[in-house]
Amino acid sequence: MSLIKEFKAFASRGNVIDMAVGIIIGAAFGKIVSSFVADVIMPPIGIILGGVNFSDLSIVLQAAQGDAPSVVIAYGKFIQTVIDFTIIAFAIFMGLKAINTLKRKEEEAPKAPPTPTKEEELLSEIRDLLKAQQEK
């Protein structure tokens, strides 16, 4: 099998397509959550903490000299990323928990008892007839 045919077979499998759709939706969801955190959650937290903007927090290791930019540890961006991750992970957890709850409810639905086969019905009739004969 040629390399191109193998790739077509791989790419056309359902799992790969499902994974690609999941990655695209996940990336879009990540942008939504990042915007939610940066634009909705962080401003009130910044006010509570005295007007601190986490993105601006950094430690200057070496000041800018001439054309060379300053060397900084931008720990504020790291804090922002950790908060984004925590909220995304929590949202995914809640979504999966809801899906699992729905699946459990579907599984717990009582199943109708199986109908007896013709052989079982005949055996039941024979049993009933034998019991009736013994009682006489």
Swiss-Prot record:
Pfam families: MscL (PF01741). Keywords: Cell inner membrane, Cell membrane, Ion channel, Ion transport, Membrane, Transmembrane, Transmembrane helix, Transport. InterPro entries: Mechanosensitive_channel_CS, MS_channel, MSC/AndL, MscL_channel. GO terms for molecular function: mechanosensitive monoatomic ion channel activity. It is found in: Cell inner membrane. Its main location: membrane. The keyword Acyltransferase does not apply. The chain crosses the membrane at residues 9-29, 79-99. It comes from the Bacteria. GO terms for cellular component: plasma membrane. It is a multi-pass membrane protein. Channel that opens in response to stretch forces in the membrane lipid bilayer. May participate in the regulation of osmotic pressure changes within the cell. Belongs to the MscL family. Homopentamer. This is Large-conductance mechanosensitive channel. The lineage of its organism: Bacteria, Pseudomonadati, Pseudomonadota, Gammaproteobacteria, Alteromonadales.
